């Protein structure tokens, strides 16, 4: 595992167990480095075999950066540049009316985390106050979006 934007590995376990991730997979918010879902042979994008098929990332929280990145990822799925993308965001993120367009096809669903991720080593002593979810856009998904829940362990 090279890195991930949270020290809480349960976030990665949850999406890996709850969704099939097309390979290779990268994290665009961290210099295109492979995610710890299934990292590249030597841990660098240039070492990956073939173009990325999916993007899994924790986008920056600040506007307009977050929406710019997410809309580009969704467009990449819609245009079949990648098969799927997923973003790790707070549970209320998808309630903003300005983001309504994001939740048309190929929006596939969410994975609600049944734990609150820790972001820093010092935070393990205190319980974080925000709940998080993975939002998934996937061209392979058929039917209505699904809601899944995962505890980050099983």
Residue map of PLM features:
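Class I S-adenosyl-L-methionine-dependent methyltransferase catalytic core
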Residues: 1-154
